[in-house]
């Protein structure tokens, strides 16, 4: 579900085959929170690029995260439902709200800031 300039919904199936489960934690596998935030950020990048004209000429750089909260563990067999909302987009600076759910239960949330730049600027800067 993608509405350019507004929102995106994305999904991540969490499998026991994920490399990170080997050490996080042995016998008690839990998806690292930083990877849940990464999934939110990637979905946010998808939303931002699909909101741009000539997206193939753009890059998204995440510049910060705020108000990160982890509410429940994510374990093998879960499906993350990622909901991203574009809160603000002004002069190439963006603010997004991301919430991750498992079976309609909120497991994590974050506000993310990003900048959308031209590829040639991104490579020189």
List PLM regions with ranges.
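Small/polar/charged residue-enriched interaction surfaces, especially the RNA/DNA-contacting tracks
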Residues: 1, 8-13, 66, 111-116, ...
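Catalytic strand-loop segment that frames the active site of acyl-thioester-processing enzymes
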Residues: 1-31, 36
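Short, hydrophobic/aromatic-enriched beta-strand segments in well-ordered soluble domains
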Residues: 12, 83-86
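Helix-adjacent hinge/juxtasegments
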Residues: 24-55
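Hydrophobic beta-strand-centered segment that forms part of the acyl-chain substrate-binding groove
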Residues: 44-81, 107-109, 114-115
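HotDog/MaoC-like acyl-thioester-processing domains
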Residues: 75-78, 85-125
């Amino acid at each position: 579900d993608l509405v350019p300039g507004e929102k995106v919904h994305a999904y991540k199936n969490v499998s026991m085959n994920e490399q990170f489960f080997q050490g996080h934690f042995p016998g008690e596998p839990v998806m690292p929170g930083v990877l849940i935030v990464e999934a939110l950020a990637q979905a946010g990048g998808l939303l931002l690029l699909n909101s741009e004209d000539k997206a193939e000429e753009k890059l998204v750089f995440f510049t910060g995260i705020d108000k990160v909260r982890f509410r429940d563990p994510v374990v093998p067999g879960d499906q993350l439902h990622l909901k991203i909302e574009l809160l603000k987009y002004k002069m190439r600076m963006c603010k997004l709200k991301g919430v991750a759910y498992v079976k309609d239960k909120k497991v994590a949330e974050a506000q993310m800031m990003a900048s959308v730049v031209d590829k040639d600027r991104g490579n020189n800067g």
